[in-house]
C-alpha cells in the first residue's frame, strides 16, 4: 500500500489518511480550542476483511471497450457507484497472458452498476470467478434489494474453517 499500513490495499500511488497522520494534522489545530478528535474507523479497520465473490456471466466487446458482465451488482457493493471506490479485482483461477483494459459491470440496467472502469485485468471468460477485494467495510450494511435482487450469502472464514453467517436470500 502506498503511504498506509502494509495490509491496506490501495491503487498504486494513492496515499491513504491513517489515524496517526489524521491526528498529527488536526491535533495542533483543535487542541487550543479544547476540542477532541473522534473518528469512525470502520473502513480502516475492516475494509480488507471482506471480498465479494462473483461469476463472469459473459464478455461483451463494443468498439474499444471490453465489458466483463458479472452476476454481482451495485446492490451487492454500492461503494464504486457512490464513491468511485477502488476494489482490486482478482480472478480466482490463475490467468496468464497480456492484461486487457476492462469495465467490470453488473447486470442491473443502471449507469452506476460498475465495479471497475478501464481496469487492466487478465483475460477472463464466461464462468470464471472473480474476487472484489476490500469489500469488508459497509459492503454488507449498504447492500439492498434494489431492482428486486436478493442479498448474497455471507461466509465467515477463520483459518481453514468457513461458516455461513447469512444465507443467500431467496
Model feature map: region roles:
Residues 25, 33-170:
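Charged (often Lys/Glu-rich) extended helix/loop segments that serve as interaction or gating elements
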Residues 1-38:
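Acidic, glycine-rich loop-and-beta core segments that form the ion-binding/anion-interacting portion
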Amino acid at each position: 500500500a502506498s503511504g498506509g499500513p502494509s495490509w491496506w490495499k490501495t491503487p498504486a500511488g494513492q496515499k491513504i489518511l491513517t489515524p496517526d497522520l489524521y491526528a498529527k494534522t488536526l491535533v495542533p489545530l483543535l487542541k487550543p480550542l479544547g476540542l477532541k478528535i473522534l473518528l469512525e474507523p470502520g473502513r480502516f479497520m475492516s475494509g480488507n476483511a471482506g471480498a465479494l465473490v462473483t461469476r463472469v456471466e459473459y464478455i461483451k466487446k463494443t468498439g474499444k471497450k471490453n465489458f466483463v458482465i458479472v452476476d454481482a451488482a451495485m446492490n451487492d457493493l454500492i461503494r464504486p457507484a457512490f464513491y468511485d471506490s477502488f476494489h482490486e479485482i482478482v480472478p480466482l483461477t490463475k490467468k496468464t497472458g497480456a492484461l486487457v483494459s476492462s469495465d467490470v459491470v453488473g447486470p442491473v440496467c443502471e449507469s452506476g452498476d460498475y465495479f471497475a472502469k478501464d481496469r487492466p485485468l487478465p483475460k477472463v471468460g464466461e464462468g470464471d470467478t472473480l474476487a472484489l477485494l476490500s469489500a469488508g467495510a459497509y459492503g454488507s450494511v449498504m447492500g439492498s434489494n434494489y431492482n428486486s435482487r436478493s442479498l448474497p450469502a455471507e461466509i465467515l472464514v477463520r483459518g481453514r474453517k468457513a461458516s455461513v453467517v447469512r444465507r443467500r436470500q431467496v
